[in-house]
A protein has these predicted regions:
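Glycine-rich FAD pyrophosphate-binding loop
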Residues: 1-17, 28
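Glycine-/small-residue-rich beta->alpha transition segments that form the dinucleotide
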Residues: 7, 151-153, 157-162
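An anion/pyrophosphate-binding glycine-rich loop and adjacent beta-alpha core
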Residues: 181, 187-248
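A short alpha-helix-loop-beta-strand transition element characteristic
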Residues: 14, 47-54, 64-81, 188-191
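Glycine-rich active-site loop/strand segments that organize a redox cofactor
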Residues: 22-56
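Conserved redox-cofactor binding core of oxidoreductases
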Residues: 60-145, 153, 157, 198-203, ...
Length: 248
């Protein structure tokens, strides 16, 4: 198996320098599973498959236990009742845990070595090649030369969706080139409308995230200079302390 990374391994928006790591939540006990599934389906607006949601929720605890058994121990929150521990899509506190970026790099880096995965960092995918109706390899740019890698199958496990947009809150190295390559060979991007969009400042600090908790100190005006939220202001202030933005 060959793993190609456009930058260094463990890079991109997921490892953005301004973030500490990854937060994850689990049902707060067996009785919380149904509520978590309902919360996911509410945000899904009818697009989420109930059976898939149920399988996802039931798989969280076993997945975390598997990490623990293999040596990656999530951190527990000191004060679990802080509003910051409510996920952006959710409506209540659950069992919050965290994984630091450094712990993830060490753990998964070792796993890749143990599985004899060959890593090609700083390598750019240029195109996929086909034989008949099947992908049979990839053309890449690596160490100042173009290479063809023959392969029985290719998995594009890539992020970069923010690169589809002119205004984005990610670093400039985030690219959507792989999505163009996938489109070129017949794949389609679906459910783009369910991406999480975060508001950002236009000025004076373009590219800075506007956190939902800043709503309570903000005055929002329409094009005529009139206040947008005179009615139900207290309700909007309460909602602004948690996600998702669609409810704020």
């Amino acid at each position: 198996v060959i793993l190609i990374s456009q930058g260094e391994l463990f890079s991109g928006a997921s490892f953005y320098p301004g973030t500490w790591g990854f937060g994850l939540i689990a049902p707060d006990g067996e009785n919380d599973k149904k509520d978590l599934a309902e919360s996911i389906q509410i945000v899904g607006e009818g697009m989420a498959d109930p059976l898939l949601v149920e399988a996802f929720v039931n798989g969280i605890d076993p997945g975390i236990e598997s990490l623990r058994r293999n040596g990656l121990i999530p951190m527990e929150a000191r004060d679990k009742q802080q509003s910051e521990f409510i996920p952006c899509f959710d409506r209540k506190h659950r069992h919050w845990m965290g994984l630091s970026k450094e712990a993830i790099k060490i753990f998964f880096g070792k796993r890749l070595i143990d599985k004899n995965v060959r890593i090609l960092s700083n390598t750019v995918l240029l195109d996929l090649t086909e034989i008949g109706q099947r992908i049979d390899g990839a053309i890449v740019y690596h160490q100042k030369r173009i290479m063809w890698i023959k392969s029985g199958s290719v998995v594009l496990a890539t992020g970069g969706l923010s690169g589809l947009y002119q205004s984005r809150l990610t670093t400039e190295d985030v690219s959507s080139f792989c999505h163009w390559v996938a489109l070129k060979v017949g794949a389609q991007a679906v459910n783009l409308e369910f991406q999480q969009f975060m508001p950002g400042y236009i000025e004076p600090a373009f590219g800075t995230v506007f956190n939902e908790k800043a709503f309570q100190w903000s005055e929002l005006l329409n094009a005529n200079g009139e206040t947008l939220f005179d009615e139900n202001r207290d309700l909007y202030i309460r909602r602004s302390t948690h996600g998702p933005f669609t409810y704020s």
